[in-house]
Structures are given as C-alpha cells and as structure tokens.
Amino acid sequence: MTDPDLELGVRTQALPRDLTDLYSLLQEASAWPRAQGSTQWNPVYPIERFAQEVEDGHVWYWKLGTAPLATVTLLPRRPDYYPAGVWDDDVPAWHVCRFTVKRTLAGHRVGETLLRQLELDAAGSGLQALRLDAVAANPFLERYYLARGFEDCGTVEIRGERSVLLERRLGVR
C-alpha cells in the first residue's frame, strides 16, 4: 500500500501553463538513471516535443498539495520514434511514455498505485493494453514492470539504443 499520509488525487490533463513544473519534474527524474549508470533519458526529452504533447492533450499529472508529484504521457498509438513494424496492430492501447514519479517519494509505492490507476482508467475507456519501452541498459525498469504484470514483448533499437518492449494486457492478472 502507499503511505496513508499521501493524497494522490486524480489524474489531471496538463495545460500549457503546467509545462515548466512538469518539465522540471522530468529533469529531476532523469538524473536518477544517469546516477545508476543508465543512458535512459540522457539527454532529457526535448522540451519542444514535450510542449507539443502537452498542447496535443497527451500529458497528464498528479499533484501532492500544489506541486506535481508524477507525470505521464499517454499516446493513443505507438510513438513516432518507434521503428516501423513495432506494435503496428489494431489493439486499442495507451502507449505509456515518460512516466515519472518524484524521487523523494521512492519507497512509498506511489508509482505502483498510479500505474494501477492507469490500468483501471484505460480498461474503463475500452482499451485492451498498456504498452511502453525501457532502455535495456536500465534493467531496474524492466524488472519493475515485469513484477507488475507486464510481459516482455521483445527487444528493438529505438533512437540508437536497445530497448525492451513491455505490454500489460488489461483484464489479465
């Protein structure tokens, strides 16, 4: 369970006025994998692309008090930087990108709680899967998602790095 003192609130769609705070959260979170020797999020995702995703309505966040505690980008189809043929199917899914929880909340199972909320929201919207990738050089992330019911769907090269594709079929535990 999450820490009972944490009030996670509801997922809120980001607006352009939220860009600075949410991008700061991404920057802060990107330092952790680098400190572990991973190349994930190095360099940090370009702010121009993130701003466009906010503008397109794909970025969401949760707040703790007045500050964002987590953010996620939910794409209705595979990211444009995936190689051709990767998840080119008709399975209705959210492609989970840049799922970030404030590092100061590590150990409180906030990410797990929010991921479960995403699963319920996706299933309630008629989607059949959550899909994501993790840089193979960051085995922590692969283990994290596998432990939460995601399946390894293979390895591909994305933006010059080997990445593991992971999928969580909804309604299956």
Language-model segments: what does each one mean?
Residues 108, 112:
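Residues forming the Rossmann-fold NAD(P)(H) cofactor-binding site
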Residues 145-154:
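Conserved acetyl-CoA-binding loop of GNAT-fold acetyltransferases
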Residues 8-24:
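A short beta-loop-alpha structural element at the N-terminal edge
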Residues 115, 122-134:
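Conserved GNAT acetyl-CoA-binding A-motif
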Residues 18-21, 113-114, 140:
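Charged catalytic carboxylate motif
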Residues 2-4, 157-173:
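Terminal substrate-recognition subdomain of acyl/acetyltransferases
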Residues 16, 27-104, 115-117, 121, ...:
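Acetyl-CoA-dependent GNAT
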